[in-house]
Amino acid sequence: MNNVISYVIIFGIFAVMMTSSINMADAELSYSKQVEFVGAIEETMGHILAAKDNIVDGNSELASLHLSHPIAELYDNLHNGLKNNPQIDSQVELALFILKNTNPDISSENFDEEAIEILKILNEAKSVLIQNDVYTNPTFKLDVISDLLMMSEHEYILGINSGGGNIGIVEFQDSHAFVVRAEIMLNTIDSLDEDKKNNLSSQLQELKSLILNEEPLDVVQTQFNNVLEEKNTITDNNFNSNIVVMSSGG
């Protein structure tokens, strides 16, 4: 798709969303569905991150695969969350369609501009569905991190079972990108005790290293378990006293 045309369409979508979106978050989604919805947005950001890395490296075939994954793999989750908001749903679908059809030989600068506008659309959809006090709650963010790690492990298994080639490379890159997004999410939890945050961050860094080196599945899965065990040691006492922590599942 012509880059200029795609920019115009994306800017137009965002302008419509800003003037027509609902101001109150949709309260109909269960807690677990809200985690899945935000997880799908974070995974989309992971695919965009992986696509950008391949665009910079000139790997257009790999970039193209990453660009196609959000609408192929994640749109159903986003659609299920947005079914009561059909206008925003159609705008998200169109944005992901534009992403899929982006020329993988695009310059990194132009891709950054396109990605920024797509992320604005996704964040606006998120603000419609997820109340701010839920999204900013540290327990919710930790649950999104768990969701990202579950999907990262799934992608790694797909990479191991792929038999090699570009498909395998893309699955490993997806796995790594989802851990990066988990790390970014962790760094937004300012209320978490510094020692706990550092311990969990160290475990995530070790996991990224194992994924990049394409270590055997049992080694990587052990580290996934280590990360989740570290995350599960976090209690209400590990947050600043002025933070109200919600219980998972409600």
Question: Regions from the language model: what does each represent?
Answer:
Residues 25-250:
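Mature extracytoplasmic or organellar-lumen-exposed domains after removal of signal/transit peptides
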Residues 1-27:
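Secretory targeting signatures
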